[in-house]
Each structure stands twice: as structure tokens, then as C-alpha cells.
């Protein structure tokens, strides 16, 4: 039996088309994926992300433990509520998961991990926590709703209490605050402003309905995927996994190499990979007809006339731009153009940094 989030009946009320997503029964769309996509880029949309896993890490060694566990350095977090994104790596430098960590105090952190990797993540975190004075607590009683888009914050403000609006006023990106019963964070997976709201399950339906009444469009996994790809954000299991190191997944910026004596898990392997040189993740743009898709081969010839091959990790038609975009893992020598093999012929594509749309506008 597939798991259902606490909002399952609300999805059915809005005529959602439900699909299996890593063992969860989730909405693919509510009628039109394209309309849902545009709602987030132009107005406000919301997603049920209650399948995500919230884990609280507490104890005297919480800071030391997370500095060992994660490739990014949570010691950078000194203001309560500040968050950072990064990878949890294995000893070979492969990405076990990408996650967000919120700093609540030196002895209390909140980590949000992907649903598809929940059991693996919890087992790994528990194993690595041995020898540290920490308590790892999964919070399955919490649901999560992401409200995203240029009007998302204004529409959410009509639903929040006075206390909650005061708490989020002027909150910068990548912060989270507990305000009443809600943990409200300025994070997201769309390239737009907005909130990810962690809410007790008992209150989730009422919050969802209040946002609906405020004119927020419910959006499914289909729009979530085209939005995150336009924003150049990785999907775990597709753009990276345990066989891929963060340098080859456009996550190099999330590795805190300094201080040099912080021995995070995977550091030694990653230093060797860095010294040798790694593949990289790039963006591809194809303005002619057709759609770039996952697993299509990518070819280019380097300055010495040698042909190299890579592969598309994620590809789609971009509703915002009106043509196809993709992310591809390729050897580092790639130039400004490449060729993609589709329908037994090669088509020329532009190669750019993997970010296509930010705040509703073309980003390249």
C-alpha cells in the first residue's frame, strides 16, 4: 500500500490525478501541469511536500556531529533560524542525499531530507551518530506545505496570525522560524520567493484550505519538476546519487573545504577526485523543436579534436521559456555548444551554467 499524506482527501477534492512517488500516493497535477507551472511563476502555487522527512538533531554534540556528517559546514550558522543546503556523503564522496539544515541553537538543529531516501538516510545518520552525545528524532507528525511564487508571501500573510506575520517580516532567504504552531521557512524548490511551512498534521487540512481560499493554486509533481529544472535544482536519484560526487553535480559550492582540519565524511575521497578532475553538470538549451530527455547521450569535441560523451540527467520542455532545457553530466572540457542524439540524429544545443529561470525571468 502506498503511503498517503494527511492532505490526501484535499487533493481528491481538487480533482488531483494521483500517482505513486517513491511509495507515496501524490498528486501529479490538478488538471493542467502547464497552468500550475505558470501560477508559480506569475502568481502563487502550493505543493504538498509532507512526504519529506523532518529530523531534529539535539544534544551537547549536535554541532560537532553535523560538522562531521555534512560536506557543508554548519559552523557557518550562528544566527538562530539560518539554514544551509548541502550534501551528506559516503566515504567514497558519493551523495547519499542533499538536504537543508536549520540552526536553532548550538545544541539543536532541524534537518529536512528527501522522501525517497528516508530509510537509508535515517540508518546512515543513526550509524554515524554513534559516539556522539546526540538524539536523532524523526518528526512524522509534521506535515509540510510549500507556497511559492511572486505573490506567495502576500497570500500567505492573509492566512498567518499577527504573531506569525511579525515573525516572518523582513526574513531573508534560507531562514526558518517557529511561529505559533508553524515552522515557517524562506526556502523552496522553484526559483521563486515563498515559504516552506512545517505544520502539525492536525492543522494541515485547515491551512491548505485557507491557502486555497486565499487564491493559491494547488500544484502537483509535474509542475514541481519543470519548475525545479528551470531553476537548475537537482532531483536526487536523477541528477545525482551515491555513485556521483558533489563536484559532478553542480554542488561544489556546498563543500566547505575550510577549515582544513574539519574531517567530514567523504573528505579524503573528494580531495582525490578534485585533484584528478571531475565531470561536471551543465545546462543545455535547444531552441528548435523537440524535447531533451533523461538519458539522451551528449557529444562534443574538445580543443584537440577529441570527441567526448556525456548524458542528460534531467530534461523537459520549459513552459516559461517556450523551448527545451536539460541538465547533463559531461567531461569538464566541454565548450559553448554540444550535440544531443535524438531520433537517431544529432541536434546542436547551447551549453550554459545550469540555471535557466529565476524569479520568473530568463537567467542566462
Swiss-Prot record:
EC nos: 2.1.2.10
Catalyzed chemical reaction(s): N(6)-[(R)-S(8)-aminomethyldihydrolipoyl]-L-lysyl-[protein] + (6S)-5,6,7,8-tetrahydrofolate = N(6)-[(R)-dihydrolipoyl]-L-lysyl-[protein] + (6R)-5,10-methylene-5,6,7,8-tetrahydrofolate + NH4(+)
GO biological process: glycine decarboxylation via glycine cleavage system
Keyword entries, A-Z: Aminotransferase, Transferase
Gene3D superfamilies in the cross-refs: Aminomethyltransferase beta-barrel domains, Aminomethyltransferase fragment, Probable tRNA modification gtpase trme, domain 1
Superkingdom: Bacteria
GO CC aspect terms: cytosol; glycine cleavage complex
SUPFAM superfamilies linked: Aminomethyltransferase beta-barrel domain, Folate-binding domain
GO molecular function per UniProt: aminomethyltransferase activity; transaminase activity
Enzyme class, spelled out: transferase
Family classification: Belongs to the GcvT family.
Function: The glycine cleavage system catalyzes the degradation of glycine.
Subunit structure: The glycine cleavage system is composed of four proteins: P, T, L and H.
NCBIfam families named among the record's database cross-references: gcvT, PRK00389.1
Name used for this protein in its record: Aminomethyltransferase
Organism of this sequence: Shewanella amazonensis (strain ATCC BAA-1098 / SB2B)
Gene that this polypeptide is encoded by: gcvT
